[in-house]
Amino acid sequence: MTINLKNFLIDKPKLSKMGDFQELKQIEGLEISAVSADLYGTGRDDLCLFYFKEGANYGAVYTNNSICSESIIWNRKIRKSLIKALMVNTKNANTFTGSQGQEALENISKHLSKVLTLRESQKEGGTNQAIKPNEILFASTGVIGEKYPTQQIKGNIQFLVDKLKNKHNKFIWFKAASSILTTDTRPKLAYEECKIGNKAIKLSGIAKGSGMISPNLATMLAFVFTNAEIPSVYLKSLLKKAVANSFNAITIDSDTSTNDMVAIFATNKVKTGKIYNVLDSKLKDFERALQKLLLNLAKQIVGDGEGAKKFINIKIIDAKSQHMAKNIGFSIANSPLFKTAMAGEDPNWGRIIMGIGKSGEKIVPEKIEIKIGTFKVAEKGKISEEYNEEKLKEYMTSDLITIEVNLKLGQASFDCYTCDFTKDYVDINADYRS
């Protein structure tokens, strides 16, 4: 498998070199390939396959948008706890494609299952087991409402399967992560290690997302792979919990995609002994590692927000409940006025006050204390006596902005992450289909 240089022959000024990313390690039991089906007409990689020869346990969370991709509809119908493959395409969302999009997945899944089955029957050390269409998951990202390119994808299935690699380093992961991008300027990759009992466990993850980011359940596309042996039912519980404070804590433009999917796959190659329930103490370190990995990927998505120049961490503390803290945090983060002020490096804290007030939460204005960075800007229902406009303006020129809102109503807190709105965001989305 070679790096496709055409992935980089596009106007993406923030596109990073492979050396800028973590060293992702091999996950035993997983094979990966990424090829070009020429969906963009440029020759860039746009089709990716993750194959589990002996199957993988999995858990997934999907978009809460009432209109969703045919890929999501397909996946929700899968009742298998052990799956064999995940295929991902970019350029086309397979959303609002009607029966054509649905029939496309039926057609492609049958063809892919036959090609994989034939490969296993002919390969030395193959399983000689038939792969079934309902053991295959799909993910799609791209333009909504365009006819799904069935024949283009189907015609490249053999090529995709022939390119599968069971040994993967940063090079292979980087190629896979690059193949699922749309308006992203860089791939997103993350790696963690942990222990279950006394067994060493690896987790490797990739993600894509740059716009249409404001999740209600998951966000955009993110896939995590581990060599641990964990039942599917526990994987899903752990994933939902980890998503709550990672992918569900970010927003770029307040839009929830029709295609959002976050999934975790466990190849069961490291036997960890019986796990009695999701609260089993053996899983604590794995839970920590999963949370850290997902938050890493989520922050990378925010950092690559369409046209973004600033990464903003909004911390709501001392709220009555986490629900209150989260509502207020997102009320601020999703405000176009707030986000454009950040882009203009304007310490207009009135837009933070506005965001707090429009959240609908019952707050006590006189108790609120607001800091931008380490600088106190408001307290006791008015501007702080410590307010220093010049120091604030200097702070606002940094790439990383932290805002803390202390409600002084309780002990709950929530961190959310967003970015600024620049003129580039408008340009990118105005030209998205061109």
Task: Report residues per predicted region.
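A structural signal for small-residue-enriched, beta-sheet-centric alpha/beta enzyme cores
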Residues: 2-116, 131-434
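Intrinsic disorder/low-complexity segments
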Residues: 117-130
